[in-house]
């Protein structure tokens, strides 16, 4: 296969998967899954993040995931009384969709990045996944905290401190490995 064919094939598969998803009404299915978790609204931002990661990873598109999940997230927290939680829920969808798209082997950006760098596509995906997994775990913890305290800036501050702690731990571990 030539370089262009290597890039075009995963994109063709992603379009096919999207068409199948539309025909199977995946949006309605995802809404029913997420809707059943609404009783545990404290964990809903974390649930939305995880669902968005898996949906974007499976479809290879963050924009398609936005289109499916953002209206669901907004509908779960209607009115001015729930504005803070609606903002947190929408941010969970956006962050999860971008994370899932970033690590998806069928994402157009991932395919083009590996082709542009002339690297093995699976190796490229594997290296991205290692870094994204650390951040995704911190995000999940941050969205659990956001659901509990329902104040976005508190959750953001705690998440940043947690991420700095993880990076400091990794730096110390790597420093010891080279000594």
Predicted regions and their residues:
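Short, small-residue-biased leader/transition segments that mark boundaries at the very start
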Residues: 2-3, 7-9, 178
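Hydrophobic alpha-helical transmembrane segments in multi-pass membrane proteins
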Residues: 6, 10-15, 44, 131-143
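Hydrophobic alpha-helical transmembrane segments of multi-pass integral membrane proteins
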Residues: 11-14, 38-76, 93, 97-101
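Helix-coil boundary and interhelical linker segments in multi-pass alpha-helical membrane proteins
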Residues: 35, 74-88, 147
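Membrane-interface alpha-helices at helix entry/exit sites of multi-pass transporters
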Residues: 82-84, 117-133
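Membrane-embedded alpha-helical segments of transport systems
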Residues: 95-104, 128-142
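Small-residue-rich transmembrane alpha-helices that serve as helix-helix interface/gating elements
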Residues: 154-166
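Membrane-interface capping segments at transmembrane-helix boundaries
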Residues: 168-176
